[in-house]
C-alpha cells in the first residue's frame, strides 16, 4: 500500500526515518513530506491508500480527490476537523492518537492558571518597558478550589498536578466517578464554588456552548476560567461580555471556534484579562514522539 504522511509531525529526522523503515520493511511505499502545505493535500494524497495528518481540515473535496483512500491515521486527539460522515460513506477507517498529549495539556493548564494569577504577561511587559518597580501583584493557586469539567485522562492528570500545588479539587463529569481526593458535584455547584475552572471536555452536540452567560454569571467575580479543550464549548461572545463587564476575573484560552491565526475581529482579542495561546497545549517534543508511535501502531493495527 502507499502510505503518505502529509506533514513531518514535529519529530526528529531519526524518528521519522525509523517510522518509515518500520512500514517499508513490511512492503509498503512510504512518502513523508517535510513541510505542511494544506493547499497541496489533495495533490499529495491523490493516489494514497493510507494518509497521515494532524489537524488540517479534510472535507468532501479532499476525499473526492483521493479515490483510493482506505484509512486515515490522525496524529491528533480530536476529529472535528474531519468530515467523518464522508469517511463513513466511503468506508474509510479513521483512527486518532488518543492519549499522546495528556501530560502536555495538563501541564499547560497549570501554566495558564499560574500565568493569569501571577499576571505573567503584564509583568513581562512592565519589565521590557524598564519600569520594573511598578509591578502587578498576583495571587497563589495554593489553597484555591479548582473545578475540573471533564474527568477523562487530561482532567484527571490536571487534578493530580493541581493537588501538588495544594489545591482543593471539585469536578463534574457526565458519568460520575470515584477518585480519591476529588469531590464530584453538580455543574451549577462547580461554577458557584470554584476559584479556577478548567475545561477538559470533548466537543459534541451536548458540549457545544456548554459554558454560556448563564454559567459565567454563577462564577465568583474573582474566579478565572481555563479552556484547553475545544473552543466551541465556551460561547465566545458571552465570555467576552463577562470579561468586559467584570463578571469574572480572567480567562486563559488555547482553543477557539476556529484554529489560529485568529481573525482581527475576534471578540476575544479585545476582551480584558485574557491569556490567549495559539493552540499549543499538545505541542511538546515528548508528546510528538509519543504521537508518532501511536500513528504507526494504528497503521499496523489496520493492516493486521
Task: Please place each PLM-identified region on the residue numbering.
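N-terminal glycine-/charge-rich "phosphate-binding" loop or analogous flexible N-terminal tail
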Residues: 1-48
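Phosphate-binding beta-alpha-beta segment of Rossmann-like dinucleotide-binding domains, i.e.
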Residues: 90-92, 98-145, 149, 160, ...
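Short, well-ordered coil/turn residues at beta-beta hairpins
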Residues: 54, 75, 200-203, 228
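Short beta->alpha connector loops at strand-helix junctions that form conserved
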Residues: 34, 75-76, 92-103, 173, ...
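Rossmann-like dinucleotide/phosphate-binding beta-alpha-beta segment
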Residues: 18, 135-221
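Rossmann-fold NAD(P) dinucleotide-binding segment
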Residues: 57-69, 84-86, 206-225
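An anion/phosphate-binding loop that grips the pyrophosphate of nucleotide cofactors and donors
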Residues: 48, 66, 193-194, 222
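Rossmann-like dinucleotide-binding domain for NAD(H)/NADP(H)
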Residues: 94, 222-304
Amino acid at each position: 500500500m502507499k502510505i503518505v504522511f502529509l506533514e513531518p509531525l514535529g519529530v526528529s529526522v531519526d524518528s521519522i526515518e525509523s517510522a518509515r523503515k518500520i512500514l517499508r520493511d513490511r512492503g509498503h511505499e512510504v512518502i513523508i513530506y517535510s513541510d505542511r502545505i494544506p493547499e497541496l493535500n489533495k495533490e499529495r494524497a491523490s493516489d494514497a491508500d493510507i494518509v497521515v495528518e494532524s489537524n488540517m481540515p479534510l472535507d468532501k473535496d479532499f476525499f473526492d480527490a483521493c479515490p483510493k483512500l482506505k484509512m486515515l491515521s490522525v496524529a491528533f486527539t480530536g476529529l472535528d476537523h474531519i468530515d467523518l460522515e464522508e469517511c463513513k460513506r466511503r468506508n474509510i477507517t479513521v483512527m486518532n492518537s488518543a492519549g499522546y498529549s495528556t501530560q502536555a495539556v495538563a501541564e499547560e493548564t497549570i501554566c495558564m492558571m499560574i500565568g493569569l494569577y501571577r499576571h505573567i504577561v503584564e509583568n513581562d511587559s512592565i519589565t521590557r518597558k524598564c519600569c520594573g518597580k511598578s509591578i502587578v501583584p498576583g495571587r497563589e493557586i495554593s489553597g484555591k478550589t479548582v473545578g475540573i469539567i471533564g474527568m477523562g485522562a487530561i482532567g484527571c492528570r490536571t487534578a493530580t498536578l493541581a493537588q501538588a500545588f495544594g489545591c482543593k479539587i471539585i469536578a463534574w463529569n457526565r458519568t460520575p466517578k470515584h477518585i480519591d481526593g476529588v469531590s464530584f458535584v453538580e455543574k451549577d455547584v462547580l461554577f458557584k464554588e470554584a476559584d479556577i475552572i478548567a475545561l477538559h471536555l470533548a466537543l459534541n452536540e451536548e458540549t457545544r456552548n456548554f459554558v454560556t452567560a448563564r454559567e459565567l454569571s454563577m462564577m465568583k467575580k474573582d474566579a478565572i476560567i481555563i479552556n484547553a479543550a475545544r473552543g466551541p464549548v465556551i460561547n465566545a461572545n458571552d465570555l467576552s461580555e463577562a470579561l468586559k463587564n467584570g463578571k469574572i476575573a480572567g480567562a486563559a484560552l488555547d482553543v477557539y471556534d476556529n484554529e489560529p491565526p485568529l481573525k482581527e475581529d475576534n471578540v476575544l482579542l479585545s476582551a480584558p484579562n485574557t491569556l490567549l495561546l495559539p493552540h499549543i497545549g499538545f505541542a511538546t517534543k515528548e508528546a510528538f514522539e509519543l504521537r508518532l508511535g501511536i500513528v504507526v501502531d494504528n497503521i499496523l493495527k489496520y493492516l493486521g
